[in-house]
């Protein structure tokens, strides 16, 4: 494979020295970019973008062409590709977000679920990864990703997104055996899916545990973290002559950083409710940290964005082990110029912390 021209993202995840703090944005290929909206219109809909490797490659590269400061590309896809490949029938309702034609509500439903083969059932994702990796030609590393078992389970049991997860939590407490079987099947599926992405060319992987923070402390350990640990222990950690770093991101997981840091990943993602300096003091000896600016800061003026970037960099302090990111995905209404101001500020203001 082509040598990497910019590997500071991978170096920071492994806490190796860097010249400036690397930066990327969750959902950096997204609706805030006019070029993305044009590609989506051309493709017809969101799933057509995801399922066509050429379109997925095109939109993955758009933010990199616009912002030379980006230190990583992330595969353009959706976390719900796995449940879709299990036969749940993913579709998108305008204004409603993702929905499933089938829901999982009984032990029999769960027992009937297949474990998808990443190459046969999710081949379009593997094709997208290899296409993007080829087109990147070593510019920056490519991040692969998946949803966590708990997060995927919530969509499968609720039939879509939910405010209170009442069906999923009822299953968890009424029928823990069924929930554990579902999570175990999902953990196996995620492990093979991420390993498929690594073999296809992903140079780091992130597990998005978007809804883990909605669990009680005890339930989080048993029904979310335990299954992410299982995945991490089964991942390919070296490929193509390089280590493949793993990032775990539990939104609203700041109370549990110590136990997440024991899961075996290289880095933890932080949402904006955490103080990154405090997080470093607690777990920085074990893992790198990624984050964690409030995405809505991007609605403020560029000077205010720059001030907030400076505050977060100062809070983390000197040395490597920090990948700058937002605390969640960039939102569709953000002005692309403000995103550019954010990215420039990270590189300009962080050099002093790496001397």
Curated annotation (Swiss-Prot):
Gene3D superfamilies: 3.20.20.210. Substrate binds at residues 27-31, 78, 155, 210, 328. GO terms for cellular component: cytosol. The record marks 78 as: Transition state stabilizer. It holds the Pfam family URO-D. One of its GO terms (molecular function) is uroporphyrinogen decarboxylase activity. It is found in: Cytoplasm. The keyword Lyase applies. Keywords: Cytoplasm, Decarboxylase, Lyase, Porphyrin biosynthesis. It is an enzyme of class 4 (lyase). One of its GO terms (biological process) is protoporphyrinogen IX biosynthetic process from glutamate. InterPro entries: UROD/MetE-like_sf, Uroporphyrinogen_deCO2ase_HemE, Uroporphyrinogen_deCOase. Its main location: cytoplasm. Pathway: Porphyrin-containing compound metabolism; protoporphyrin-IX biosynthesis; coproporphyrinogen-III from 5-aminolevulinate: step 4/4. Its EC number is 4.1.1.37. It catalyses: uroporphyrinogen III + 4 H(+) = coproporphyrinogen III + 4 CO2. NCBIfam families: hemE. Belongs to the uroporphyrinogen decarboxylase family. Catalyzes the decarboxylation of four acetate groups of uroporphyrinogen-III to yield coproporphyrinogen-III. Homodimer. This is Uroporphyrinogen decarboxylase. It comes from Pseudomonas fluorescens (strain Pf0-1).
